[in-house]
Amino acid sequence: MIEYKHVALRYTDKNILKDVNLHIEDGEFMVLVGPSGSGKTTMIKMINRLLEPTDGNIYMDEKRIKDYDERELRLSTGYVLQAIALFPNLTVAENIALIPEMKGWTKEQIASKTDELLDKVGLPAAEYAKRKPSELSGGEQQRIGIVRAIIGKPKILLMDEPFSALDAISRKQLQRVLLQSFK
């Protein structure tokens, strides 16, 4: 469960968010819709403490977000950015392995799950695992970003325009993969 209680964010004299109250139950999908600059990305960044509210509190499972250890919080949160943030010096497989490695998975577990998820998103591991991000299209990079976010089975998945670089067919395929991953 995630809950925003009277959350606000101000930069100097400008209110970015004002008195936001929101309740999201476990297992619930929630979409923030609004015009550019309305605070959607800001709200997402607050959940994993990339930004801190100036007023109010955000809770996860009835505990204030700011009371969580940042590493613990971020390991339990998958995050897909609109601007894909793959490490350029790492291969696709190495990018995907980051969270599982931090969680103590074995190399075999990581390789098996990486191969499975790459295949599910239409990027066969035999063909893509050893590539660098510079060798991928924007849509392929976006799919890798989604695989990296879901491989560790996060409690919360935050997505900021995750399908913007994808065609309609790839978008539908990824939506199915995401729904199956969180059943």
Task: Locate predicted features.
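The feature captures the beta-strand-to-loop junction immediately N-terminal to the Walker
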Residues: 33-35
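Catalytic Walker B motif of ABC-type/P-loop ATPase nucleotide-binding domains
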Residues: 157-160
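Conserved ABC ATPase "signature" region
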Residues: 108-127, 177-180
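Conserved signature/switch motifs of ABC ATPase nucleotide-binding domains
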Residues: 152
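Conserved ABC transporter NBD signature motif
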Residues: 56-64, 73
